[in-house]
Amino acid sequence: MSDRIDRDVINALIAGHFADPFSVLGMHKTTAGLEVRALLPDATDVWVIEPKTGRKLAKLECLDSRGFFSGVIPRRKNFFRYQLAVVWHGQQNLIDDPYRFGPLIQEMDAWLLSEGTHLRPYETLGAHADTMDGVTGTRFSVWAPNARRVSVVGQFNYWDGRRHPMRLRKESGIWELFIPGAHNGQLYKYEMIDANGNLRLKSDPYAFEAQMRPETASLICGLPEKVVQTEERKKANQFDAPISIYEVHLGSWRRHTDNNFWLSYRELADQLVPYAKWMGFTHLELLPINEHPFDGSWGYQPTGLYAPTRRFGTRDDFRYFIDAAHAAGLNVILDWVPGHFPTDDFALAEFDGTNLYEHSDPREGYHQDWNTLIYNYGRREVSNFLVGNALYWIERFGIDALRVDAVASMIYRDYSRKEGEWIPNEFGGRENLEAIEFLRNTNRILGEQVSGAVTMAEESTDFPGVSRPQDMGGLGFWYKWNLGWMHDTLDYMKLDPVYRQYHHDKLTFGILYNYTENFVLPLSHDEVVHGKKSILDRMPGDAWQKFANLRAYYGWMWAFPGKKLLFMGNEFAQGREWNHDASLDWHLLEGGDNWHHGVQRLVRDLNLTYRHHKAMHELDFDPYGFEWLVVDDKERSVLIFVRRDKEGNEIIVASNFTPVPRHDYRFGINQPGKWREILNTDSMHYHGSNAGNGGTVHSDEIASHGRQHSLSLTLPPLATIWLVREAE
């Protein structure tokens, strides 16, 4: 039992400086009897009501005009369910007292959250509609162990931090409160007095929906239902599957022509999805769709890691978009950013007045390239927040893969830092051991919980084993972007063909390390911004040669071992750099048939042909699937190789990277017979010169390049051709 409340406690409670509201508010046994206390600012009268009968049991005395009420319930000794009849501004309202409910988080959940091993922390933390003791409302939970006081504020309480202070679970540092009547769609934030005594308003790290910039409140929103992984979607991610990825920034793929406004998720489902399917792509990759305050970050500086951005609609609208993609046979990859977060005061930065999510030392916790903060992966609750987020997108939205951004910046402590600007690890090395363990753990958990979904790493160094299993010392990613291949091949293609013979190795070097990782060949958004020019504009020569070079390059890329990725606009050879504030240049495809149509048709045919022939994708990561036929003809800039499937069927790929047609070009082959040209980037269908081999060509029993049989081909200028052997 306790005595009646002290005046200093009332003052602290009303001032918002009292950390343990449940010790004061609600129903308590005292020496005077069963006492009910309530903090109800602006109320004039308060009664305790029996819910079943509506009978008034006692009127509470106003002990402080600022809204503190208390009263003893006559003839009652044991706790019972009650309601409060409150008169505000002359009108009576019947409410349930949030301080009559017991602890919300179960002991096992609290233990797992503290340990950092809760697989799905989002099922406990955040805002969740619930029914407790027959009362509907919302339970709120937030991790802020160093805050002095935390309250829920929102549309349900006039954004008044005095009205709903939360209970601190000291064993976990989590604050919790069930608010009767709070419901889906209402805005809320957490108001806290932080570790330094400063008043802060924070959005919910686990909010499932959030306001669009410039507003920053969270929305009460229930968890979406789980999405079942189908066998078809699992197969589409496998190493032997054809994977051709269309990378998209939803805000600039296409816009309304009358006002330059974004398409909604549902409009994108109706326009983007069928377009990507028609183009023959197998996967859509979305630049980050997590809520973010700055359009110019392209989503790579998220503040709402669990909330799809409202720029294009609601959470359910985004689910509709994903469902439409799946119905069209497209898997969906989400760019995921666990490497850093922005410094905006309303979000994770100094969340409870301490460096809770980030490192305190800027040599570990600040990324000077992007003016962002770096997660403290060594803190269990932080890693749990991120691992749970990865699982959330896959399980609750049906995301099929996560492309992890800026992995190199995570795994190296000296990334983009000079001497003295970074702190070595415990062994004196430059590796961020905590980040490495976080990535391994994330990939392990995803492999166990949602097998079939995969991860891809954008890793720009030669860190070993990025896409190798953890038991082999790897990070456990399924795929890694081959940025070295991308840089080498683009450096080669931008050269005048006269000088390419001196840089032949830029095209041949990639195969030397090709089987060290499971590579994706990316022509991503990063290659068409910041003055790098468009892919088309990097090609040398006049307009005809630029387009011919681009077509030859695409033919080479789609044939080379590795999965494919192409950023939007490149499929029809957009001439300018990407602008996130405007639509792609779809007008280039208006009017009569032109070179842009030709490139678009080529990319579609590349996708369809690549998908149809197993030799082009089945053994991307097995040396048996590739063999050079001509690798050393640098004087004529000719390269020829075969792709092979598990059954030994071959496709010959020949590229001529000069504008000079090569007639009667003889080279040795493995399999004699009749070979049919199935793709020619110089075809008139693509607005080329239409040089080629008339459809089919027969091999000769003439030795060449160390082989008994050979083919004699016409290699079109600035072109790549594919040939398949026909059955006799």
UniProtKB/Swiss-Prot annotation:
Single GO biological process annotation from the record: DNA damage response
Annotated GO MF terms: 1,4-alpha-glucan branching enzyme activity; cation binding; hydrolase activity, hydrolyzing O-glycosyl compounds
EC number(s) per UniProt? 2.4.1.18
Which Gene3D superfamilies does its entry note?
Answer: Glycosidases, Golgi alpha-mannosidase II, Immunoglobulins
Q: Which CDD domains match?
A: AmyAc_Glg_BE (cd11322), E_set_GBE_prok_N (cd02855)
**Name of the top EC class for this enzyme:** transferase
User: Which pathway is it part of?
Assistant: Glycan biosynthesis; glycogen biosynthesis
What the entry lists under InterPro entries is as follows: A-amylase/branching_C, Branching_enzy, GlgB, GlgB_N, GlgB_N_E_set_prok, Glyco_hydro_13_cat_dom, Glyco_hydro_13_N, Glyco_hydro_b
The catalytic site is made up of D405, E458
For whether the record's keyword set contains Transferase, the answer is yes
> Which reaction(s) does its UniProt entry say it catalyses?
Transfers a segment of a (1->4)-alpha-D-glucan chain to a primary hydroxy group in a similar glucan chain
Which residues are in coiled coils? none
Which family does the record assign?
Belongs to the glycosyl hydrolase 13 family. GlgB subfamily.
Give the protein's function: Catalyzes the formation of the alpha-1,6-glucosidic linkages in glycogen by scission of a 1,4-alpha-linked oligosaccharide from growing alpha-1,4-glucan chains and the subsequent attachment of the oligosaccharide to the alpha-1,6 position.
What name does UniProt use for this protein?
1,4-alpha-glucan branching enzyme GlgB
**Organism encoding this protein:** Escherichia coli (strain K12)
